[in-house]
Amino acid sequence: WGYPTGMDRYLTIDDYVNGYVNNAVDNIREKAGLDKITLLGVCQGGTLSVMYAALHPEKVKNLITLVTPVNFDTNKGLLYIWARGLDIDRIVDYYGIVPGDLLNSGFLLTDPFRLMIDKYVGIFERIECNPNDTACSLRNEETVKNFLRMEKWIFDSPDQAGETFRQFMKDCYQKNLLIKNKMELNGKKVNLKKISMPLLNVMAEFDHLVPNDASVPLNDAVSSSDKETLIFPTGHIGIFVGSKSQKEVCPGIARWLKPRSLLDGTGNGKGKGKREVRKSQASEA
């Protein structure tokens, strides 16, 4: 849904879940001629997808969550500890639209040495070579370009609509209502037990933003009999873009999804009815 502007400051989580996401799902269902579709959400988008699947289970065939927080009562990540003491009202009332740069600053401070010093020292070490080695220089040029592309993507964090940020921080981070089935959107309770479709919960073992403790409880919170967890030895960003992890993450999701995407004549996939936790052997790039 792009980058929010001043006119979007009053959009709520309900607007995103029951508005934008629901409209997108309905559009795909109509164009594909299906009753249900597979929904995959990443990080905060995964949390919104969980809410959507709980409120509209009749439209979701399979639910895939990727590094998605649902349990915010954890001390494994600084983000969760800090959030409990933040004056959310003061932040939202001051900014209206919460700047993405402000959020990025907070993310960097969760692991400042690694994220602000170590990785930049590392890139210089990676591109060191003999000045007369033309092949090495060409490889380094592409290495630097890829590094800068990644930096641009990482720091391209859209601002957040104020009221959405207010509710997400208060109801999720501070009150932990979602996992307790006490969160409400437009007066309707989000009950995770309504999620009965096949679930794939994908995590990064070394995630500093969404520790596994924040994601694992989803499996017990839903009523799905067909649910699986995949854990990859990467960080929060590495699970998307690490060269080695990409050889495992996407194929792993595809292997899980393929047998569950077969139609049984009603728009439903044929679940395999298993519960399993597997850890990938991929290395972090």
Regions found by a protein language model. Name each.
Residues 40-45, 49:
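Gly/Ala-rich beta-loop-alpha elbow adjacent to hydrolase catalytic centers
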Residues 39-41, 66, 202:
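Short beta-strand immediately N-terminal to the catalytic nucleophile in serine-hydrolase-like folds
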Residues 208-214:
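Conserved alpha/beta-hydrolase "acid-adjacent" motif
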Residues 234-248:
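Catalytic histidine-centered segment of alpha/beta-hydrolase-like enzymes
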Residues 30, 34, 49-163:
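Alpha/beta-hydrolase-fold enzymes
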Residues 195, 201-203, 207:
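Short beta-strand/loop motif that positions the catalytic acidic residue
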Residues 10-31:
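Alpha/beta-hydrolase active-site loop
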Residues 215, 220-237:
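Catalytic histidine neighborhood in serine/cysteine hydrolases
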